UniProtKB/Swiss-Prot annotation:
It is found in: Cytoplasm. GO terms for molecular function: ATP binding; proline-tRNA ligase activity. It comes from the Bacteria. This is Proline--tRNA ligase. The gene is proS. Its EC number is 6.1.1.15. It catalyses: tRNA(Pro) + L-proline + ATP = L-prolyl-tRNA(Pro) + AMP + diphosphate. PROSITE patterns: AA_TRNA_LIGASE_II. Catalyzes the attachment of proline to tRNA(Pro) in a two-step reaction: proline is first activated by ATP to form Pro-AMP and then transferred to the acceptor end of tRNA(Pro). SMART domains: ProRS-C_1. It is an enzyme of class 6 (ligase). One of its GO terms (biological process) is prolyl-tRNA aminoacylation. Homodimer. Transmembrane segments: none annotated.
Length: 514
């Protein structure tokens, strides 16, 4: 292992935060923009988002939802109707107050004092309130329910400390909003969408997650219940990768979303909302990346196979290109994971080794080099991103299949890469969860022994509320810890709460988090 020369100069073990930024740069995913806290998502990064979007959109539509689009501007009065909701977002809201600019007489521009809006407009931080207005118009009777909608959009939350893909002032996401006749139906739908997120994360992104309910202090502003999927990054921190909220009638009462039931009575709807964002890409980086850059699971890779002809600006280049074109033509007729194999023939000029490492850093699942000798021998030089190195020689672990062999095996190879990435991440996650913690002192010692990657701790607690919960939160805050969620389908605890000493009623995960 010591004689392997990795592609990145910054190593995960040395500086995880710097390594994360290096992967984004070297994989050419995104860059900082001229607007503080906002990023430019570049073609490879946006291609990954498009794959995530397509796969998740199919799952959302399979559960009966239809896509809509609402304005990015929301009247301030919409938020004022829901006090708890606006309090949760007030410090992050960007507000438009004028509709015109004028010259300042010195070559600059200023808002025109005569063009002040009658009512300020909030730049969308989330859309419960504006969806609520529409639901109040669209829903009249029980026949209009359930109303199942989803929106793909950008949102703005003015963050003070930003990090690309994890926390930016503007980001891309989907947000679902639904209305139901009863609490039971709405709660069931909340969990249905949580399961959609779990399946998407694990099956498409190869991210092992824990699904569960958030504690009272971590609920979405205005929600009755908030559920999340939590993933463990390679530094042991938790990443909240998606949330699903049961909102009760809180937003319905604020927006007057009512329906006439079968008996002719008038009732408030029970609503839900749920969302995931480009934060998922940050999760992919920190779960699967290594000291050679990004590794993209095949299901979300814009290109699953990249073919690199070793062109030398010689007459034989034409024959080599034809050989590569023929290989590409055969591969794209094959199906893998229910879709045609996505193949790029990279004909850009450049040295073979430089182009290879460019695609290794980007995380393309399979990189194929084809030179004149490969063509003469009727083979290709294949490199799997998940099996990059020959441990004994310290050199790239090239394989040499024939085009026919590759065509026959491409689907199973991509399946193997996808399954292997999930398995590796799941094994690592499970190995870094501490169970059997029976006291707060034991928890404190676990996070105070100087280890870099201490993972999560599973503990029993009594589900305190109010001031008692606030004391727990403060004790954890001193250790830079938070309660992640209450995992679903766990056996009933038999011990005592490590925070209050009372009989435990639930298991929870505690961790440092992004």
């Amino acid at each position: 292992m010591s004689n392997i020369r990795h592609a990145l100069t910054v190593k995960r073990e040395d500086d995880f935060a710097a390594w994360y930024q290096a992967v984004i740069a070297e994989a050419d995913l995104a860059e900082e923009s001229g607007v503080r806290g906002c990023m430019v998502i570049k073609p490879w990064g946006y291609g990954i988002w498009e794959r995530i979007q397509r796969l998740l959109d199919d799952r959302i539509k399979a559960t009966g939802h239809e896509n809509v689009y609402f304005p990015i501007f929301i009247p301030l009065s919409n938020f004022e109707r829901e006090a708890e909701h606006v309090e949760g977002f007030a410090k992050e809201m960007a507000v438009v107050t004028h509709h015109r600019l004028i010259g300042d007489g010195e070559g600059g521009l200023i808002p025109d004092p005569e063009a002040k809006l009658e009512e300020p407009l909030v730049v969308r931080p989330t859309s419960e309130t504006i969806f609520g207005d529409a639901m109040a118009r669209w829903i009249q009777s029980w026949r209009d329910l359930p109303l199942l909608t989803n929106q793909w959009a950008n949102v703005v939350r003015w963050e003070m400390r930003t990090r690309m893909f994890l926390r930016t002032s503007e980001f891309l996401w989907q947000e679902g909003h639904t209305a139901h006749a009863t609490a039971e139906e709405a709660k069931e739908h909340t969990l249905t969408m949580l399961e959609v997120y779990r399946a998407h994360a694990e099956e498409d992104l190869a991210l092992p997650v824990i699904a569960g309910e958030k504690p009272e202090n971590e609920r979405f502003p205005g929600a009755v219940e908030t559920w999340s999927i939590e993933a463990m990054m390679q530094d042991g921190k938790a990443l909240q990768a998606g949330t699903s909220h049961y909102l009760g009638t809180n937003f319905s009462e604020a927006a007057n979303i009512k329906f006439q039931d079968r008996e002719g009575g008038e009732k408030y709807c029970h609503t839900t909302s749920w969302g995931v964002s480009t934060r998922m890409i940050g999760g992919v980086i920190m779960t699967h990346g290594d000291d050679d850059g990004l590794k993209v699971p095949p299901r979300i890779a814009p290109y699953q196979v990249v073919i690199l002809p070793m062109l030398r600006d010689k007459p034989e280049d034409d024959a080599l290109l034809a050989y590569c074109e023929d290989l590409r033509g055969k591969l794209i007729t094959e199906s893998a994971m229910g879709e045609p194999v996505r193949v790029l023939l990279d004909k850009k000029p450049g040295k073979a080794a430089a182009k290879r490492w460019n695609w290794v850093r980007k995380g393309a699942p399979i990189v194929i080099e084809v030179g004149g000798r490969d063509m003469e021998n009727g083979v290709v030089s294949l490199l799997r991103r998940d099996e990059l190195w020959n441990e004994e020689t310290g050199k790239p672990a090239f394989q040499a299949p024939t085009p026919a062999q590759l065509t026959d095996e491409i689907a199973s190879m991509l399946d193997s890469i996808q399954a292997g990435m999930f398995g590796t991440a799941q094994t690592w996650r499970n190995a870094n969860v501490m169970s059997g913690c029976t006291s707060f002192e034991q928890l404190r010692d676990h996070y105070s022994d100087g280890k870099k990657h201490v993972g999560w701790v599973e503990v029993q607690w009594s589900k305190p509320t109010g001031q008692e919960l606030e004391k727990v939160v403060e004790k954890l805050k001193d250790l830079k810890l938070t309660i992640r969620n209450v995992p679903m389908d766990t056996p009933a605890p038999t011990g005592s709460c490590i925070f209050t000493g009372k009989p435990a009623v639930e298991w929870i995960y505690v961790a440092k988090a992004y």
